[in-house]
Amino acid sequence: MAKRTKKVGIVGKYGTRYGASLRKMAKKLEVAQHSRYTCSFCGKEAMKRKATGIWNCAKCHKVVAGGAYVYGTVTAATVRSTIRRLRDLKE
């Protein structure tokens, strides 16, 4: 593992390359993709990224398609709320 500092965190592996602002953007993405998320099926904080857009729960072993870097996306939330609203209108 590459040595990281307190200030730069996970992007310390890039050293002085690519510029500070690009490293800040990369840090935001990398922290999001490596963190654990709450599983929508079992409620445990065990959802981890397996590959690009594929999320796996370590507890209930559900595999879900999600965002590339985060479990849930803004578009998915919009679609979910639209479907819920249309279902309520139908009833």
Curated annotation (Swiss-Prot):
<dbReference type="InterPro" id="IPR011332">
    <property type="entry name" value="Ribosomal_zn-bd"/>
</dbReference>
<keyword id="KW-0687">Ribonucleoprotein</keyword>
<dbReference type="Pfam" id="PF01780">
    <property type="entry name" value="Ribosomal_L37ae"/>
</dbReference>
<comment type="similarity">
    <text>Belongs to the eukaryotic ribosomal protein eL43 family.</text>
</comment>
<keyword id="KW-0862">Zinc</keyword>
<dbReference type="GO" id="GO:0022625">
    <property type="term" value="C:cytosolic large ribosomal subunit"/>
</dbReference>
<dbReference type="GO" id="GO:0008270">
    <property type="term" value="F:zinc ion binding"/>
</dbReference>
<dbReference type="GO" id="GO:0003735">
    <property type="term" value="F:structural constituent of ribosome"/>
</dbReference>
<dbReference type="InterPro" id="IPR011331">
    <property type="entry name" value="Ribosomal_eL37/eL43"/>
</dbReference>
<dbReference type="InterPro" id="IPR002674">
    <property type="entry name" value="Ribosomal_eL43"/>
</dbReference>
<feature type="zinc finger region" description="C4-type">
    <location>
        <begin position="39"/>
        <end position="60"/>
    </location>
</feature>
<keyword id="KW-0479">Metal-binding</keyword>
<keyword id="KW-0689">Ribosomal protein</keyword>
<dbReference type="GO" id="GO:0006412">
    <property type="term" value="P:translation"/>
</dbReference>
<keyword id="KW-0863">Zinc-finger</keyword>
<protein>
    <recommendedName>
        <fullName>Large ribosomal subunit protein eL43</fullName>
    </recommendedName>
</protein>
